[in-house]
Amino acid sequence: MTAHRRHPAAIAILLLLGLVVVGGAYSLLAPKTAEASAVSADSVADGRALFLANCATCHGLAGQGTKAGPSLVGVGAASVDFQVGTGRMPLAGPSVQAAPQDPIKFTPEQIASMAAYVASLAPGPAIPDSQYTTGKDGNVALGGELFRVNCAMCHNFAGAGGALTRGKYAPSLQGVAGKDVYEAMITGPQSMPVFNDANISPEGKNSIIAWLKTTQAEQNVGGMTLGNLGPVSEGLFVWVFGLGLMIGCAVWLGQKSA
């Protein structure tokens, strides 16, 4: 038998041929991925143009922050979607706290583009999946427990909001969209702490949203709610009106018997 020697370049040719076949097959079977990348690049470019025109004055040309506004590097798309999507940004004027404004100054497409640009600066919280922002399939009992432990101290036990220090306040959560509640938890706007997935899981956040929607849909069986502000407002009401009424009655009875 005669031994056949392989050409030294045979292995290299086989590897090159294999790469060509695999690369060609991938390009044929995954055209949508390439299209998605192109759209994403266009979205980032559009977002940068919007950012430079509307945000760079306060946040810097590269989002690095200035004396007039904080850095946006690492805040993620969720922060932009929350702040701009609720009308808190652009800031209407100098104030202690940004308040939601209506109407919103940008379209959903423009907000998505700006969010994509800010997300490209550095990793940060992404816009949440819709399956965790509707409250559907959430555990209402668990949501109520999580809310009382983590949120009620500022937002009140009924989500009616409350006063904070230095002129700030915790806004009411009544009628707030589930996505806004979720994004606030993962971005921590203003004085609010951040509740990432290690603190409260996505399922837990969805349960909180379910609890908020359930309490808001409950029918009031009667009585004065006093703004649902809890024992402080109730105590003030008793002291001012209740005690005042008692003093008035005492004075009236004293004059009558005199």
Regions found by a protein language model. Give the residues of each.
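Generic secondary-structure boundary signal with a strong preference for alpha-helix termini
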Residues: 98-99, 155, 254
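Periplasmic/extracellular electron-transfer cofactor-ligation site
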Residues: 40-44, 48-74, 82, 86-92, ...
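Ser/Thr/Pro/Gly-rich low-complexity linker/stalk segments immediately outside membranes or between
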Residues: 30-43
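Extracytoplasmic electron-transfer domains, predominantly the class I c-type cytochrome c fold
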Residues: 73-122, 164-220
